[in-house]
Each structure stands twice: as C-alpha cells, then as structure tokens.
Amino acid sequence: EILGYGNTNDAYHMTAPQPEAEGITNAIKQAVSEAGIPSDAKLYINAHGTSTPLNDKTETLAFKKSLGEQAHTALISSTKSMTGHMLGATGAVEAIASILALKNGIVPPTIGYKEPDPDCDLDYVPNKARHADIDYAISTSLGFGGHNACLVFGKAE
C-alpha cells in the first residue's frame, strides 16, 4: 500500500540537479515522514538512478541527508539499468518494481555496475538480485527542470 508521498520542484536548471540535493532531499523527507518509517526499518530504495555522474552523486547525497544512517543500511538499485529510461512510463514501472521487491523479498540489481564512484558509497545491489526481508520500499522519480517525487510503499495488511 502507498504510505507516503513527497514532491518538490527546485527549478535549479533545465537538466542538471541542484548540487546540494535540497529538492530531492525534501521530497524524500516528506514521503518518509508521512509514512512514519521507524529508524530501524529495513529499506529498499528504487533510485531514479540514471547512471550519470551528476544525478547519481546528487541522489546519493539526498539519500544520506534525508535518511541519515539508515541510508547506509538500505538496499538501493536502479531498475533503469535493465529497462532503460522510459521517460513518462518510468515512475509507474519503477513503482511496480518497488512493490514486487517488497512483496517477494527479492531486490532487483543494478546491472552493469563496474566502477563505483567514491561519492556513491552506498549499497547499490551490484549486478545480482538479492533476497532480503524489507519493511518498506521507496521509489524516487526526478524530472527535467527540478521535478522531484518520492513514494513509500509498505506491505498490505
């Protein structure tokens, strides 16, 4: 079920993310706060993850700023590594991937992950899916012009 939603628009640049990740951070904080995620919860994050240097560093920074230490224990992947960027369909497809990871306990990998960037130092589930018991799934979607959205899913009761 959808437990939380956040959205912002930082309007920093048409294609580049705001370097301090304020908009993305605030969208994640809104969604996590609305969902009431406890600090000890096991998280999966389906990152926007375009595999571009600016986006990946900025999104990593946003995870750290919004989740604190929880970012370092979260399992994070980019399903774009398997599907490509589907533009308008991306948010819906990645929401489905997030829900399936939560339901089935299988976190999709970030395929083609070869040379980690030192600024991207979280667990990006490289190259192979991982079985994991997760409590919440978070999906981030970022758009041109600084549009930032985040959904939090929990297991249906």
Enumerate the language-model features and the residues they cover.
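Structural signature of cysteine-dependent C-C bond-forming condensing enzymes
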Residues: 1, 26-40, 61-82, 90-144, ...
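Condensing-enzyme catalytic core mediating Claisen C-C bond formation in acyl metabolism
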Residues: 1-35, 44
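Glycine-rich beta-alpha junction loops
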Residues: 4-11, 49-51, 80, 142-143
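Short glycine/threonine-rich loop-to-helix capping motif typified by GTGT followed
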Residues: 12-20, 24, 50-67, 86-93
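A short beta-alpha structural unit
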Residues: 43-52, 79-87
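Generic hydrophobic alpha-helical membrane-span motif
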Residues: 54, 151-152
